[in-house]
């Protein structure tokens, strides 16, 4: 998707910093996604898009994946996440979310869910 990535220096710097200090769940999820393990789909980590940084993104499939830690539990954060997901969907990126707990405890189920999301047709 040409022109989708956000090249503002602030976001690029933030994304680089996030790549150097991933959470345990992000490390585990990256192990599932890297090197085209899911039917050859290529994912990137900490991708600046539309004013946000998406934890993992497959641009060709229009799919973003978020690893949500405990900070995503309160109502205010849930509303922000919903608005963020809607803004990214408007740019052609569907967001799916997994809790850090699920990523660490049920990686096979997470991998299956990602595979199903990749198989779905992206919204128009």
What do the predicted segments below correspond to?
Residues 1-42, 90, 119-124:
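Solvent-exposed, charged helical/coil patches
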Residues 12-23, 45-121:
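Basic, amphipathic alpha-helical patches used to engage nucleic acids or provide basic targeting signals
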């Amino acid at each position: 998707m040409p022109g989708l990535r956000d090249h503002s220096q602030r976001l690029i710097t933030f994304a680089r910093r996030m790549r150097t200090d991933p959470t345990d769940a992000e490390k585990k999820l990256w192990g599932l996604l890297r090197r085209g393990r899911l039917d050859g789909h290529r994912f990137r980590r900490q991708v600046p898009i539309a004013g946000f940084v998406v934890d993992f993104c497959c641009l060709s499939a229009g799919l973003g994946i978020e690893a949500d830690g405990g900070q995503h539990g309160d109502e205010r954060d849930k509303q922000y996440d919903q608005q963020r997901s809607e803004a990214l969907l408007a740019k052609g990126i569907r967001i799916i979310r997994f809790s850090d707990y699920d990523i660490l405890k049920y990686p096979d189920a997470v991998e299956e869910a990602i595979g199903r999301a990749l198989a779905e047709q992206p919204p128009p």
